[in-house]
Amino acid sequence: MRRLPIFFLLDVSESMAGENLRQLQQGLERLVASLRTDPYALETVYLSIIAFAGKAKTLTPLVEMAVFYPPRLPIGSGTGLGAALKHLMSEIDSQVIKTTPERKGDWKPIVYLMTDGKPTDDIKDAVYRWQKNYQQKAELIAIGVGQYADLEALHKLTPHVVHL
């Protein structure tokens, strides 16, 4: 059966500490609980968690929903969105199964990017690479949290931007 890869690209910078991080953790848990009630999602959805602050790190590689458990999110300094995007693109390249003449690949991945700040690294190259090579391969939904979220930077990546 074809998989539906869902990547969560989560800002875990110091500004997310406290209530924002708690809400993020609870939101992940509620989403997973909701998806687990859908038999089709149980068979097709694979989840991955990538956390970023100054650097990006995969906390959970793509794993089937039935065995997924939301990891504890670490806190770091900086909001390295450029590094996070590069890491995400590498994960898409290595973990998403492509369609070949012999078999159907994965469904188009969905990426949920959540951040509450302004990038602290240069995002220009990563944004260009995303737009050129990945924008058609994956559906990205960006969520800006709070009054300091850089919505302009998020709009460079996707037209699907939500501000909370």
Segments from the language model and where they lie:
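Von Willebrand factor
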Residues: M1-T60, V67-W107, I110-M114, I141-A153
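Short acidic-hydrophobic, aromatic-tinged amphipathic segments that line or gate anion-handling sites
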Residues: V161-L164
